Swiss-Prot record:
InterPro entries: SfsA (IPR005224), SfsA_C (IPR040452), SfsA_N (IPR041465). It comes from the Archaea. The gene is sfsA. Belongs to the SfsA family. GO terms for molecular function: DNA binding. It comes from Methanococcoides burtonii (strain DSM 6242 / NBRC 107633 / OCM 468 / ACE-M). HAMAP family: SfsA (MF_00095). It holds the Pfam family SfsA_N. This is Sugar fermentation stimulation protein homolog.
Amino acid sequence: MVRNDLVMEIPWDIEATLLSRPNRFLGIVEMDESTSSGPFQEKVHIHDPGRLEDLLYPGNRLLLRKATNPKRKTGWDVIAAKADDGWILINSIFHRRIAEWAIANKVCSCFENVLEVIPEQKFGDSRLDFLLKKSDTELWVEVKGCTLIYGNTATFPDAPTTRGKRHVGELKKALESGSEALILIIILRKDALCFKANASIDPDFAEVFKDAVNAGVQVCPLVFGYEGRELFYKGMVPLCTEEYNSI
């Protein structure tokens, strides 16, 4: 990967240390700034449904941004968490904007000749992330954010995902109906060199993923790095294994 294209600015306000995670969407942190009585704690919102056990553990460092809604129960949003390869964006609210950037900049070949981008379109029993109208066909796109890495292998999911399995199954049905279909993987670990479905965490998802790819559903794994207050596109990586016969 040799790209380093600026995607967007994602500012943050303060660093903090994670103390605990009472539930998926709530964290308790100790803020770096102190009051006259010493360090203080805050409740923060975690905008990512994954386990993130390699990033959200007691003692790890976080980047926070002040929430703009004064009526919220949590006054801060978690933007990123510290890892060996730098700060990792773990706020999934940005995934749609990242995907829109990728589509607009045609970083995957299947994004050529797109005439219209329709978000959140219903197909079957699911609502898929995008329907792209092209000059000669239509392309259904489902976006998956990936923050888990083993060595240089990025993998999804980090927890069993019935919803993810259903979405991939719907993409295969879209393909069978005559449309094109794509799984867009947003990898937020810049050391990643390849991607694979996480069979050790969710073997059912891995099997559905494999079946979809072998049937002709396209996969576009894109690597992004969060540096300073900016997100950069680093390039596309392949699938890790040779078990997908259509790649």
